[in-house]
Swiss-Prot record:
SUPFAM superfamilies: Aldolase. Its main location: cytoplasm. The active site is at K85. The lineage of its organism: Bacteria, Pseudomonadati, Pseudomonadota, Gammaproteobacteria, Enterobacterales. The gene is fsa. This is Fructose-6-phosphate aldolase. It catalyses: beta-D-fructose 6-phosphate = dihydroxyacetone + D-glyceraldehyde 3-phosphate.
Length: 220
């Protein structure tokens, strides 16, 4: 299983990378824009924060296949080994096919249906990113869509994997993993929710109080 953080906040990546067994960092245009930094400045800093073995993802901005391919090459030249995120539109599928021939690794993003995700995988995307909470917000069933996509990839595109995105709660992320999803990317607030468990803190405080009452200190 691969766990990613969905952010361009370098300081938070450095903090959480010490705690979480993360495989890397995913970004998108909105996330980079929120950082107020040039993508060409923030990407090297993010790569440094996750180390050489960490995988970094960044998205193209062009709407046409030719522009997507050109931007993907620029990203790959700047950060060798970067995974380029391509929106799964008609032009995006064409770009994914071309980038596959160039040996540039891609992720099909903005996936709202299992059939859309399957097309991205068949075109050559290594990763496919279904938007779980956004599907729910539109009246769909994000987890069911992930289950369907996971099954389709297992049968028809085994070299590709689901990298589920767009979570609002830890429960959504866990449900994706239970559905067989091999990778997820968490926004910072959801990652932090996984760490903030009041019941755990209460249990630890009780242990400490009992120990201190018995021995007068908190040392072993």
């Amino acid at each position: 299983m691969e766990l990613y953080l969905d952010t361009a906040n370098v300081a938070e990546v450095e903090r959480l990378a010490r705690i979480f067994p993360i495989a890397g960092v995913t970004t998108n245009p909105s996330i980079v824009a929120a950082s107020k930094e040039s993508i060409w400045d923030v990407l090297p800093r993010l790569q440094n924060a996750i180390g050489e073995e960490g995988t970094l993802f960044a998205q193209t901005m062009s709407r046409d296949a030719k522009g997507m391919v050109e931007e993907a090459k620029r990203l790959n030249n700047a950060i060798p080994g970067i995974v380029v995120k391509i929106p799964v539109t008609a032009e995006g599928l064409a770009a994914i096919k071309l980038l596959k021939k160039e040996d540039i690794v891609t992720l099909g993003t903005a996936v709202y249906s299992a059939s859309q995700g399957l097309l991205a995988a068949l075109a050559g995307a290594k990763y496919v990113a279904p938007y779980v909470n956004r599907v729910d917000a539109q009246g769909g069933d994000g987890i069911r869509m992930v289950q369907e996509l996971q099954t389709l990839l297992e049968h028809h595109a085994p070299d590709s994997m689901v990298l589920a995105a767009s979570f609002k709660t830890p429960r959504q992320a866990l449900d994706c993993l239970l559905a067989g999803c091999q990778a997820i990317t968490l926004p910072l607030d959801v990652a932090q929710q996984m760490l903030n468990t009041p019941a755990v803190e209460s249990a630890i405080e009780k242990f400490e109080q009992d120990w201190k009452n018995a021995f007068g200190n908190l040392n072993l």
